[in-house]
Structure formats: C-alpha cells, structure tokens
Swiss-Prot record:
Binding residues for thiamine diphosphate: 78, 119-121, 151-152, 179, 291, 373
One Gene Ontology biological process: glyceraldehyde-3-phosphate metabolic process
Family listed: Belongs to the transketolase family. DXPS subfamily.
An MF annotation (GO) of this entry: magnesium ion binding
Annotated keywords: Isoprene biosynthesis, Magnesium, Metal-binding, Thiamine biosynthesis, Thiamine pyrophosphate, Transferase
List of residues binding Mg(2+): 150, 179
Name used for this protein in its record: 1-deoxy-D-xylulose-5-phosphate synthase 1
EC nos: 2.2.1.7
Length: 645
C-alpha cells in the first residue's frame, strides 16, 4: 500500500525510524497515516473513528518511547490501526479482521509491539502496572504506557488499577484519550467530572508542562479548544484543589491537544524525562478526526462496513430479515407497552443491544449504567427484588464480567432478573475476544437459572414474552449476531412452557438430532441431504438448555439408535448437561449412541461467521458427517465435498 502519496510514511519500517525524524517529518507521517487508515478501512470495514482520533498520539508515543522495550498497552484496541501500520503490519492491513488476516485488536501472538492483548475495556492500566512491577523486579522491560479512553476509564477496574498504581508510586504513564465518545456517549459522574474541568494544576515537577498545555490551548482548533476548556474543569472540585487523579497519587498533566504534534511531543518528552512516579496525561481528541463523514456522523464512524472514501457511504447488503437485536428491541418495547413494570438495563450498549428502541418510547425506564456490568447486574437484581421486571441486555462476552454478581446477587437470592444475551456464539470479524461461547455453561451451572436459546427470530419474540412472565427466579435467553432467517414474526409473543422443547421433524428411528439455538436451520438442511442418502433423521428443538425437557430426551433415546446434540457453545454446555441428566436417569444404559457437537476446545480467530462455524465443524455438512460417522455409513467424500461447496 505504498505509493508517492506517502513519501514520509514510506520511510517507516518500524517505530525506530520515527525516532530519527524531525518534528516536522513526524507531522507529515501523521498526515499520511491518517489518509492511509481511511483508505485501508474503506476496503475492510472496522473501527475507523477511534483510530483516526489517535493518529498523532500514536506517532508521538512511538517517537518518544522505546517500543517494544517500553510496553505500550492500548485499552480495548479499537484505536490500534495507526499503531499496527507503524509497527510493521502496513502490508497486512488489507487482511484486517479477515479470515487468516490480522486482528482488529492488539494481539500478543501477532507482534512484539502488542505486549498485551485487548478487546474488552478498562484493562490497560492494570496491565501497565504489571509491566511496571516486572521492570522494577529486574525483568527486561522498560517504561509502561497505557492509553485509555474516557469511556473505558468510567469502569470500576480502571479505578482499582489507578488506586493500586498510586499506592505503589512507581514510574508509569497513563494517557487519557478524552473524546467524549465511545460506542455511545459516556455516562455517569466521572464523565461529568471530565466534562467540568475548570483550572490547571501547576504544582509538582510538571508545572512547566502544564503551562505549555494552557498556552497551546488558544491555538487549537475549536473542537479541541472546546474540549480542553471542558476538560480543564476537572482539576478543581476537591477541597485541596487537586485533581481526582492527583488524589489517587498520580501527577496530572493536561489537558493537551491530542492533534497538535508539537505539543504532544513536548509533553511526552518532558514527562518521560521527569517522571519518578505514576503520571496521567490528559489528551483531548476528536473521534473521526480529519475525515469529514466521520466527524459529522453521530457515532463518529465507530464501527463501519466497507465504504466509499469520497462520499463516506457504507456498502451494506440489503437484509432479507430483521436482525435479532432489532427483533428483541421491538419485542421488549411491545412488552413494556403492556406492562409498566418492565425496565431495561444496558452497559454502554443501548443501540448494540436494541434497548434504544424501548428508550425512544419509554426513556425513563431504560438505564445505561456505562461500562459497568457488575454494577448493572446488581442494580437490576435490586429492582427485581421490589417487583419490577428488569431485562438486563448485555452481550454474552461482556456478561462474563458480571458473573459473580449473577451468582451472588441474582441466583443465590432467586431474583427474577431477565438476561437478554446478544451476540451468542461466534461473531465474525471481532474474533475470539468477542465470541459468546461460554454463557450456556456458566449460567447452566447455577441453581434455579432458566436458560433458553432462540432457534429463529419468531422464537426470540416468544422468549421475550416468556421471560416477562417468569417470576420464579432468574431467566436468560440467548441469540446470535446478525439477521434472522426470514420467518414470519408474531404480533405478540406466546409464553412458552418452561423446560419444554418441540419436535420439528419425525424420522424413522435411526438418528435424532437435538438442537439448541439457531443451528436448527443447519440441522434441517442436513436432514434433507441425509434423506437423499437414505437416512431419515428426527429433529427436535430443545428450546431450553435448563431445565431440560427430559421427557423429550427420553423419547428420543428410547426410539432411536443414535442421538446427536448440536449447540453454538463451548464444552461443558448444553451437550454436557444432556449427558449428565441422561446418566442420572439411566438413559445411557439403553444402547442409544450419544454424540455431542459443540465448539472445539480452542479459541477461533476472526473470519466470516459461516467460515468460523465451518472451521468448528458446526455447519450443515459437519452435522451430516457426524450423523454418517455415528451410524457407520460410508457416504462418498466426493459427494460430501460437492454438497459443502
């Protein structure tokens, strides 16, 4: 991707090349880098806005610090594309977030410049402190630098880390990338605090750098100048007129213009030269900086599909069915219209989970708690204790962050919190870090928990209604990313009988396939292929991973030679619960062969979801092959491969 449009960037094979450049040349690198990021993401899709906001910061950090010996930790990693280009992965950018390509996040196995993987928020300061302790204990590492956004710093883990870092008092650097914009606008008191800075701190060894920041403010573009003015109000507000960060033991520098290369270099060089303990540098940036369509968009082009660089118009395939997220949001809104006790809780993902649809109709009954899943779960539990009906809508991968609260505050007390688990299963371009692989197992282990999985979007509508009617304890329902199957949607949901599955297709007694979730359509497709080969399979939709429909399972075992379970989850999930329950009931002694199909015992890297499930053996032909193996049939490999294509 090198051409005459990027003469200065072409000279950068790695960060060491930046350190021999003049400040003017570094400015040129940033300008060329920004254009290249836009061009690269236009071809692959990805997290554009956040990456454009840290172009100058990425160049400046690598120019000042001795990476990879100095450890640079990006929080979340949405903003890491400039970093990847600067650290030897420029030629690989066309493979960004593609199967077999480079990750959309930092990843230890990908580069020595990625010392710590990222994707979930608010981990960077903890990791940086760990590297700092390692340095001080004689390990071959230098300074540690954490870059964290104003959304991520709102999470409790960030404060736990800052509290510990302040107590340790060791030399490390935290750069607060303050753009007032994560996926959704940051919420909570800390966001307000960051938005109300009024006076710069001039005490301590960094007084001169603070003065530089203040002097440069008037020269900054209006968005940054306004951000700096807003940010300066952070510093007072405590009785001794120190910042919140200073109270935690950090030296505070800022706010500075995160797009002014001269200012960034001056402050970073000065901080590196003078720091003896933990330092927080507060940078004001503009998400989507330098690309007009991104700067003018409400979400600043946080996550985009492929797009036209000239117009910014994204190429999105026309959907034949609504997304599962949209179906959930609409079903929840309908339920809320009927039942005033229904409320919704989300953790900084109102649009991602679909609860923004309910918020438009009932803004006072939808609560965005910020990046705070632990708090959100307990918050919902207390509302359930008073008779409200909270729907806690959180992605499967992020619900893991609140597991202790699910156990201690919800399940142990038998409180009827409704967990709407979006992005269940494999999710595509975001890869292993965002896969919803484990919720069946970690929720199914809890006494009193009901766990459902929707086979299609119509079933999801019924499960929303079922959750709304369930008051005997916690209940969860899972559904995947992406669009539904196109089945007709009911106007209102039907309350399902707890723990009862359904027969989909009656076979001839050779093999039964018990499906949980949206792989039901693959099971049906597999049955059609098998029928052409003389195998007439029975198919059932379990609907519930817990409690299991033991009457259905017993019937399948007693009337078939083989039973295969299919799920979009990890080991120790649905199949394991079926086997354990069969063992307890003596059903394993009846001679029916039992096989389980689940995700393999490894993390699966990014690719299109269909490719990921094919890799896992959880697609139509994977099911066909499992059936033929268990029955001892010898379908020709040529036939199977032809059907797979």
């Amino acid at each position: 991707m090198t051409d005459t449009k990027t003469p200065t960037l072409d000279r950068v094979a790695g960060p060491a090349d930046l350190r021999s450049m003049s400040d003017t040349e570094l400015r040129n690198v940033a300008d060329e880098l920004r254009a290249e990021v836009v061009e690269a993401v236009s071809q692959t899709g990805g997290h554009l806005g956040s990456s454009l906001g840290v172009v100058e910061l990425s160049v400046a950090i690598h120019a000042v610090f001795d990476t990879p010996r100095d450890k640079l930790v990006w929080d979340v990693g949405h903003q890491c594309y400039p970093h990847k280009i600067l650290t030897g992965r420029r030629k690989q950018m066309p493979t960004l977030r593609q199967g077999g390509g480079i990750s959309g996040f930092t990843k230890r196995s990908e580069s020595e410049y990625d010392p710590f993987g990222a994707a979930h928020s608010s981990t960077s300061i903890s990791a940086a402190l760990g590297f700092t302790i390692s340095r001080d204990m004689g390990q071959p590492t230098g300074d540690a630098v954490a870059v964290i956004g104003d959304g991520s710093i709102s999470a409790g883990m960030a404060y736990e880390a800052m509290n510990n870092a302040g107590h340790e008092g060791r030399r490390m650097f935290v750069i607060l990338n303050d753009n007032e914009m994560s996926i959704a606008p940051p919420v909570g008191a800390m966001s307000s605090y960051l938005s109300s800075l009024s006076e710069l701190s001039r005490a301590g060894p960094f007084g001169g750098l603070v003065a530089i920041a203040e002097g440069m403010e008037q020269l900054a573009p209006k968005p940054v100048r306004d951000g700096a003015r807003r940010a300066r109000e952070l510093v007072t507000g405590l009785e001794n007129r120190g910042t919140f960060f200073e109270e935690l033991g950090f030296d505070y520098i800022g706010p500075i213009d995160g797009h002014d290369m001269a200012q960034l270099l001056s402050v970073l060089r000065g901080a590196k030269a003078r720091a003896t303990g933990p330092v927080l540098i507060h940078c004001c940036t503009v998400k989507g900086k330098g690309y007009a369509p991104a700067e003018g968009s409400a979400d600043k082009y946080h996550g985009v599909s492929k797009f036209d660089v000239g117009t910014g118009v994204q190429a999105k395939a026309k959907a034949n069915a609504p997304s599962y997220t949209a179906v959930f949001g609409d079903a929840l809104t309908t339920l809320a219209e009927e039942d005033p006790s229904v409320v919704a809780v989300t953790a900084a993902m109102p649009s991602g989970t679909g609860v923004d649809r309910m918020a438009k109709r009932f803004p006072n009954r939808v609560f965005d708690v910020g990046i705070a899943e632990q708090h959100g779960v307990t918050f919902a539990a207390a509302m359930a204790a008073t008779g409200l009906k909270p729907f806690c809508a959180i992605y499967s991968t992020f619900l893991q962050r609140g597991y202790d609260q699910i156990v201690h505050d919800v399940a142990l007390q038998g409180l009827p919190v409704r967990f709407a688990i979006d992005r269940a299963g494999l999710v595509g371009a975001d890869g292993a870090t965002h896969a919803g692989s484990f919720d069946i197992g970690y929720l199914g282990a809890l006494p009193g928990m009901v766990v459902m999985a929707a086979a299609d979007e119509a079933e999801l509508v019924h499960m929303v209604a079922t959750a709304g009617a369930h008051n005997d304890g916690p209940i969860a329902f899972r559904y995947p990313r992406g669009n539904g199957t196109g089945v007709p949607l009911p106007e209102t949901g039907r309350v399902l009988e707890i723990g009862k599955g359904r027969m989909i297709r009656e076979g001839d007694g050779e093999v039964a396939i018990l499906s949980l979730g949206t792989l039901l359509s693959d099971c049906e497709a597999a049955a059609r292929i098998l029928e052409a080969e003389g195998i007439n399979a029975t198919i059932a939709d379990a609907r519930f991973a817990k409690p299991l429909d033991m009457a259905l399972i017993a019937n399948l075992v007693q009337t078939h030679k083989a039973l295969i379970t299919v799920e979009q989850g990890a080991m120790a999930g649905f199949g394991a619960m079926v086997l354990q329950s069969m063992a307890a009931e003596g059903l394993l002694d009846l001679g029916c062969k039992v096989r389980t199909m689940c995700l393999p015992d490894r993390f699966i890297d990014q690719a299109a979801p269909a490719e990921m499930y094919r890799d896992a053996g959880l697609d139509t032909m994977g099911i066909v092959e499992q059936v033929t193996r268990v029955l001892g049939r010898d379908l020709k490999v040529v036939t199977l491969n032809a059907k797979r294509r």
